[in-house]
């Protein structure tokens, strides 16, 4: 019985720690500089070591931004309506049920588009080519 209680406490503490993500100061500073008006920010650490902030900006849809551990901005994803996807992307998705769509701006200046179809994220360039 004592072992079960100890195991239960360990699991609870482990789960709590897994969901409470505190990025390094350099990441927080980079985020605040890029998104000074961000609200309702929730941080998580991804498997690849990147830090992801999910947040809202006044007058915008839901957003997320990824940063490297040293504070470099990597990309920003903004939720958009299906109708806001470029026409070639919409054509490439014809006949598919799209649950969510997003525009992803990359640090190299490129923009790609994401469409969630059957629990999978499909990525396209503006010409409708799947990447």
Language model segments and positions:
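Hydrophobic/anchoring residues in structured secondary elements
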Residues: 43-45, 78, 103-106
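N-terminal targeting signals for Sec/Tat export/insertion, comprising classic cleavable signal peptides
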Residues: 29-62
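Short, non-transmembrane alpha-helical segments in secretory-pathway proteins
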Residues: 21-40, 81-101
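Conserved histidines in hydrophobic membrane contexts and catalytic metal-binding motifs
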Residues: 53-54, 106, 111-121
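Flexible "stalk/tail and boundary" regions
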Residues: 90, 95, 99-113, 126-131
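Short, glycine/charged-rich beta-strand-loop motifs at protein surfaces that mediate ligand recognition
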Residues: 17, 76-79
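Bacterial Sec-dependent N-terminal signal peptides
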Residues: 1-23
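Amphipathic N-proximal alpha-helical interface segments
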Residues: 53-77, 120-131
């Amino acid at each position: 019985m004592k072992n079960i209680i100890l195991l239960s406490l360990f699991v609870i503490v482990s789960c709590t720690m897994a969901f409470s993500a505190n990025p390094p100061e350099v990441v927080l500073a980079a985020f605040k500089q890029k998104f000074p008006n961000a609200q309702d920010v929730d941080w998580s650490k991804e498997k690849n070591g990147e830090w992801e902030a999910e947040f809202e900006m006044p007058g915008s849809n839901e957003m997320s931004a990824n940063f490297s551990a040293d504070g470099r901005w990597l990309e920003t994803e903004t939720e958009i309506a299906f109708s806001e996807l470029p026409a070639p992307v919409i054509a490439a998705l014809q006949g598919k049920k799209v649950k969510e769509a997003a525009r992803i701006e990359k640090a190299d200046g490129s923009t790609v588009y994401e469409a969630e179809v059957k629990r999978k994220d499909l990525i396209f360039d503006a010409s409708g080519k799947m990447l």
